[in-house]
Structure formats: structure tokens, C-alpha cells
Amino acid sequence: MNFNINILGTGGTRPLHNRYLTSVLIEYHGESILFDCGEATQMSLRKQKISWQKIKMICITHLHADHITGLLGIVMLMAQSGDTRKEPLTIIGPIGIKKYLETNIELLRVHKNYQIIYKEIIINKTEPVLYEDKRKRIEYIKLKHSIDCIGYLFIEKDKPGKFDTQKAESLNIPKGPIRKKLQEGYEVILNGRKIVPSEILGEIKKGLKFAYITDTAYFEELSTYIQNFNLVIIESTFKDDLKEEAKKKLHLTAKLAAQITKKAKVYQTGLIHFSERYTLNKDLYELLNEAQQEYPNGNIFLAKDGMKLKANKDKFIIK
């Protein structure tokens, strides 16, 4: 299955020597989608030997520095790589993302040899579906932070089941366009008889659902957007002893993150966006322990810089 999730960074506020700022990249059927682009994201791409030229879309959650300061560098890198990029780059984010980037491009006189397509989200007005093709769709949800902030949902479409050649032949369905339409999930009329895909296709293969959620305070409705998702990468900025600070700063504790995914019956939960105060492994494992105590059957793990998750049937395997 051609579906990988790469963890480029896991920290909040500022990068550390062993922890870059929170950023996640999806590789899906030869194309890449980048979620957030803080300082040093470019370094993570280099370390993990990921081609920036394959990035077709960059989705920014909000206009705080630790989520956008690497964006200009990526745009410049794409332009300076031998003038080979021909595909447009789509950048999605809240109102202001275009002004932020275009102002910097103008001031620094950046030469671009490719088109940037901006899609600025007006929360509660922009339609939830941001992008859709035959394989997938990308939606946004409103989060609760000190400025406009967006969570992203990557939803793979269901796939038709295996084509039963013997059944097709027994129904005298000829090879060619009619079989192709059935394989694509469409009904056909053959010799006056309606044939539905379920007659010759095996069980539908459910598509995978992934969510990227940071930065946000806890709110009840959040779990409704990610019901039964296969994997949710969600901020876990603080341990529970700092829950009041988390509430004040509109962030989550690891325990609250687990409450959200437990309520949503999420299959796998990845914790991310750790406070810079947690520099020791024991601090991070305390975060993990608090989340696991809240959701013991939640398949909860710590996201780590350089981690790669590979889709395997209905779950993601950490490589």
C-alpha cells in the first residue's frame, strides 16, 4: 500500500538539537502533502531523504512562528533546485498565509519558476472539503486556540473489492468498458438487465482516515470530527500537572488528548508538539504514561523525529 506518514518534527515553540518543530508529511501514491512547516523542516526532509519536489500541497494550521517559519525556505528550495519544478504548489491555511509568504518573497526578491496556488480558509464560511480526487479528500475542522487554527483530515476513499472474473463470465459480461465501469463502482445495463457492482466485486476495502490536530484547547465537539479514525496525530504539549497552564494557553495535556481520541474510538493515537521544557526521555514517557492510563486500549505512542509509519491494511506500522 502506497501510503506513508513521516514525522519531521515533534516540538513546540522552538527547535531543540534533537527535536525539530512539529511537522508531518504524507507520502501517497507518488505525491506528498506537508502539514505545518516550522523552522528546520527543510533539515528534516534532507535527513529523511524525502524529495521536496514531490510536495504538491502544504497545509498550515495557524500563523504562529513555530508552525510557519520554515515555509519560505521550502518555497526557495523548490525554486533553486535547477529550475526543474513545473508543477504548481498549493498552500492552504488561514487568512493571512498569502500575505505572509508573498511579502517575504517580494522583500527577499525570491525568483519562483513555478506557480503557487493559495487557498485561504475563512473559518465557518469555507466549505469543509478543501480538496478531492478519485482516491482521497482533505477536509478542515476549526480548532480552539488563541488565533484562528485549523485541524486537517485526510480521508482515503473506499476501494472496490476484488473483481470476480468467473462470476463476470457466468453473467456474460464482456471484457472492456462495461467491466471497467463495474470495477469503478458503477451500475451497468446489459441486455436490458441491471447489474450492480456487488454482484461481481468482493467486499469493499475501507479507506484509511488520518487526522493532524495541533494547536488546540479541549472542547467537546472535537471528538465528533474524528470518529473511528485509523490514526490521529494530536498535540500533547503538557503533562497533567500543568493542566491549568494548558487551559490558559489553549493547549492540550497528554491526558486530554487521550480523552478526545478515546471518545472518538480512534484506533491509533500519536502524541506530538511537546513543550520545550520536556528535554529528557523520562519526561516524554511520563506524558505517554498519562495518555495510556486514560485510554489503555488506544494504541498510543510518542511521535518521534524521523519516525515513519507505513499503512498496512487498517492500521499504520511504525518502521
From Swiss-Prot:
Co-factor(s): Zn(2+)
Active-site residues, record numbering mapped to chain: 66
Binding residues annotated for Zn(2+) 1, in chain numbering: 62, 64, 145, 215
UniProt keyword terms in alphabetical order: Endonuclease, Hydrolase, Metal-binding, Nuclease, tRNA processing, Zinc
Known catalytic reactions: Endonucleolytic cleavage of RNA, removing extra 3' nucleotides from tRNA precursor, generating 3' termini of tRNAs. A 3'-hydroxy group is left at the tRNA terminus and a 5'-phosphoryl group is left at the trailer molecule
HAMAP family to which the protein is assigned, alphabetical: RNase_Z_BN (MF_01818)
Membership in a protein family: Belongs to the RNase Z family.
Residue numbers binding Zn(2+) 2: 66-67, 215, 273
Protein name, per record: Ribonuclease Z
Record's signal peptide: none
Quaternary context: Homodimer.
CDD domains: RNaseZ_ZiPD-like_MBL-fold (cd07717)
Functional note: Zinc phosphodiesterase, which displays some tRNA 3'-processing endonuclease activity. Probably involved in tRNA maturation, by removing a 3'-trailer from precursor tRNA.
E.C. code: 3.1.26.11
Keyword Nuclease among UniProt keywords: yes
Provenance organism: Borrelia recurrentis (strain A1)
